[in-house]
Amino acid sequence: MVSKDKSAKYGSKEGYDADVMIDSKAMLSKEDFVATGVLTYALGDIIEVELPEYDVFALGDKCKMTVYTKSGLFVMDTTVVAKERGSLIVLNPPENRRKFTEKREFPRVDVKNEGLLFGLQDKNKKLKHQFETPMRFSIKNLSINGLGFTINENVMLEKVIQKNSQLEVELILGFLVPCTMEIVRQEKTNDGYYYGASFISIPEEKTNALRGFILKNQIETYFVQKRENETKKALEKKSAANQ
C-alpha cells in the first residue's frame, strides 16, 4: 500500500521518475483472464509489458494494469495498441503520466515528412512576410509540442527567419495540419539551416490525428530498435561462444 507521503507526491512537479516502473512486475487483466509479466519500457503515451500470454490479448482490448514498483503500487485502465512476439504495447493514461517526471515532457520521433511555409512575422508582429509561392521544408523530428526541420541553402531565409520568428505552415503527414509555430533554435548545417520550433496553435480537430501519428511512429521506432538490439546481443553471444 502506498504511504500518504508518497501519495502526496503524485501529480506534483517533484513526482516519481518514470524509470521507477522499469523492470517492475506488471499484471494485466481483462474479463476473466489475468497475465503477469515485466514492464520493460515507459515513455510518453506508451508502456511495454513483456509476458508469455501476449497472444491472448488483441489490439484494442481494454485492460486493467497493476504495476508493483519499489515506490508503490500503480493501478490504471489502459488499452492494447500494439503487440509483438512476447510483448504488448499499452497506452500510458494521462492520470498515470501525471504521477511521474520524465526527461522529455513529450517524446520526439524521427520522421521523413515535409511541410509548406506560407509566411512569417517577428514576435511583436511588426514585420510580416508572405511568400508568393509556399516554401517546402523537410521535417526531421516531431513531438506534440514542436518539431525540428531543415530548409536547403537559402541566404534570404537566413536573414528573415530568426529566433522567436512566428511561422505560418502546413505539415504534410499523410493528412494536412495547418498551424503556427515559433522558432526556438537555429543553426547552420552543411546542407542549409536546421530550425527547432514549438507549436503556438493547431486546429483542435487536428490534435488527435497528430498525436496518433506520433504514437504510431514512436511504436514502430521502438520495435525496430528493440529488434536491432536483440540481433546485436545474439551475435555477440555467438561470437563469445566461438572464442
Report residues per predicted region.
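Structured alpha-helical
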Residues: 1-243
